[in-house]
Amino acid sequence: EYAQFEDRAPVTTRKAYWVMTYNIGFGAYQRDYSFFMDGGKYSRARDEESVIADICGVGDVINNTAADFVFLQEVDIDGTRSYHVNELELLNEFVTGYYYTFAQNYDSPYLMVPPWEPHGANKAGLVTYSRGEITDALRRSLPISDSFSKFTDLDRCYSISRVPVDNGKMLCLYNVHLSAYGSSEEVRSGQLGMLFADMKADYDRGNYVICGGDFNHNLRTDASS
């Protein structure tokens, strides 16, 4: 899914741009919130009002930051855990002047865990906002585990949004949220290998590449490398 509008803002070379990446945690993560799969207490947001307040806060952060490109993860469009608030629609009421793409990367059946407060059924995805015109967008499915964790990893993917640059090249915006819970090294390596191969292919074509998102693990044990 993507949206366009008439006011086209060209992306130019030799200009500094601001980039923001933000896992918004389905609108649940307040200061004292802890998620059950991280060893915490909760599986859902506190209530509908808190979800709406948190998402409005995310919109304020984006507007106040005035980033040119924004990568968001865990944006629910319909979920038990977020009280069926369509967070994409709510964000778009606050965030103006952007083109955007949405790529669904989570579509779970009704999960009966934890037993005291089931996580429920949820649909969520990746949202990419761009001041420059997005002329092409692609969703790429990632390999996932065959273990029980596949029920929390359904439809893992990354999105590629392409923005024309004034020199004829493309700016390729990669938005990613890799597997976290129970994933094997083989799954992690497969996901990163696929992502890096696509990024390199775009780079080798002479395009510009920016990747933002939640990798769920350190990409390098030695940051200097």
What is each of the regions a protein language model found here?
Residues 68-69, 171, 208-210:
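Short, Asp-centered acidic motifs that coordinate Mg2+ and/or phosphate
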Residues 183, 187-225:
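Metal-dependent phosphoesterases centered on the DNase I-like endonuclease/exonuclease/phosphatase
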